[in-house]
Amino acid sequence: MKKNNLSDVKKANRQLVYECIWSHKSVTMTDLAYVTHLSRPTITSLVQEMTADNLVIKSGYGTSNGGRNPVLYHANVNAAYAMGIDLEFPKVRMAISNLECENICFSVRIYPKDADKDQVLQLMKQ
């Protein structure tokens, strides 16, 4: 059985909090602490790290029955991108999408039938 060190626990907690933010779309730190069963200081630290890493964004303020309005957080869907390339004669299709699978960029290029690999790569760079 593998022992968990502090680094492993922190990574697991960070992943748990990020998945909670992702699935709830807009959530407060109090909600995160309730759902994840982590302490408020742990949640605060992890959310600050993820905000600094641009994974999480402040999305506004929630409502309160008294006191300060809580800050709402949501996942930054543009924190990372995926790229897909489809090479099929006689064309190259390329797409870039964000974390919500929204197309950011889509391109189709036609290459000549006698093109070699270097010409196809050059066409893709354009």
Language model: regions and residue ranges:
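Extreme N-terminal segment that seeds HTH/winged-HTH DNA-binding domains in transcriptional regulators
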Residues: M1-V35
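Non-catalytic beta/alpha edge segments that cap or flank active sites
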Residues: W22, V47, F106
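A short, glycine- and basic residue-enriched loop/turn
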Residues: H24, G62-N65
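N-terminal helix-turn-helix
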Residues: S26-K58, R68
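Short gly/ser/thr-rich secondary-structure transition/capping motifs
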Residues: N65-G67, Q126
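Gly/Thr-rich phosphate-binding beta-strand-loop-beta motif of the actin/hexokinase/Hsp70
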Residues: N69-F106
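N-terminal phosphate-binding loop and adjacent alpha-helix
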Residues: F106-Q126
